[in-house]
Amino acid sequence: VNRPGRDSHVLIAALVLLVIALVMPRWKVGREVFDYIVIFDVTQSMDVEDYDAGGTPVSRLNHAREAMRWTLRQLPCGSRIGWGAFTEYRSLLLLTPVEVCENYNDLIASLDNIDGRMRWANASEVGKGVYWSVRVALSTESKPDVIFISDGHEAPPLEPGAPISMPEDVQPGQVRGLIVGAGSDAALPIPKTDDDDRRVGYWSARDVVQLVSPDGTRILSTEHLSALHEPHLKALAGRVGFGYLRLTTPESLAAAMRDARFARRAPAPTDFYWVPLGLALALLV
């Protein structure tokens, strides 16, 4: 019985397997992944602080970004995500979708810079922004799904019952997507910020366009205050064939973005280093 010789062969084999595990490249294997453009409303109503983080008030935009940071860690490798911003009446692509694992740090760094400094106007025509988000997705090579995060606050306000005309080039179901409603049911003052996104006060009733009665004698709205306009966002979602989600916790957003209806079958880099590693450990037991 040549036990020492056998043990040395086992150790050499285990060492070879460990080296293979260390240098083994990732193989592309078909799996369920996701492809998104996430568009953030960066208008001033999104600065309303009606979320709470451990007793500290948090703005709608900051809560949305924090939820997206958490969601990024939940998406499987091979998934792709890009960023966009909505202000005035347009949704603009900021970052074309990239793979989430290889580009995680860059995605986080760019996400942190999506804020009010990107505003070029104080108007907020959310309905038009939703339609533009469809155009953005259609103009992107992979035709990604859309996540549109907004409180639905229209400025200037819409006349009650007035429809938002749908452009001819946008049709229901052209792309898949989800409108995510940010904010609470309570109407709160809208912070006023400068070009560097520094707070300089709050908007007052005389600073903004208000709806008035047909005879011009009564103010019918409080457009200097903002709450989540959920019925409006749900109606917009229905017009373009999107789903709707109210933004509560990061977990709820991650679950919605991992929903099977948004999954795509695509080759994705997959680690198999655990195979030689497991064999090496088995030899050493």
Regions from the PLM with identified roles:
Residues 80-113, 136-137, 255-256:
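Short beta-strand-loop
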Residues 33-34, 46-81, 99-103:
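…and closely analogous acidic/polar surface helices at protein-protein or active-site interfaces
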Residues 28-44:
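Alpha-helical transmembrane signal-anchor/signal-peptide segments
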Residues 171-285:
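Von Willebrand factor type A / integrin I
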Residues 1-32, 258-285:
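C-terminal signal-anchor/stop-transfer transmembrane helix together with its immediate cytosolic
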Residues 44-45, 88-91, 152-155, 183-187, ...:
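Solvent-exposed loop/turn segments at secondary-structure junctions
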Residues 50-61, 93-97, 114-123, 219-224, ...:
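Second-shell loop/turn segments in exported
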Residues 92, 112, 117, 123-178, ...:
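Exposed acidic/Ser/Thr-rich ligand/metal-binding surfaces
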